[in-house]
Amino acid sequence: MSVQLLDKTRKINKLLHNNNSHKVVFNDICDVLSDILKSNVLVISKKGKVLGIKNREDIPEIHELIEDKVGLLIDSMLNERLLLVLSTKENVNLTTLGFDSDNIEKYQGLLLPIDIAGERLGTLFLYKLDAQYDIDDIILGEYGTTVVGLEMMRSVNEENAEETRK
């Protein structure tokens, strides 16, 4: 294992260990993943709601089909395509997801289903311009997906506990 991979893994770990509120905010994990994977990052719920987002200044945003604000819904057909992805897909041609804006062929996507305890909770969607994802990127993406999935489960459990108390 390379030292760089270990260092990047530790950056993700810090989200879990250095958090006083005991909650990982989805934008925080997007910030970290964007930094270490040099990508624009979205956390999307199973229903298509944007839970977290980070766009880098050096990568032009794709506005087509994607809402770039937390709480808004992405295009329903795009969400259906994302939910059909059952395992990590790297270096995805974004035209296969329905994007057709100018220069879209220059982008590469990394699609990571968020599955915890056999339940699909959403998708981690990353993309970058003029570069491919390598094996280290995939490892870090999958690790980040685990952190996001655990936080999603914690959020669901807290909501259920609150409803039970009412």
Feature locations, PLM:
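Hydrophobic, helix-rich cores of sensory/ligand-binding and other regulatory modules
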Residues: 1-166
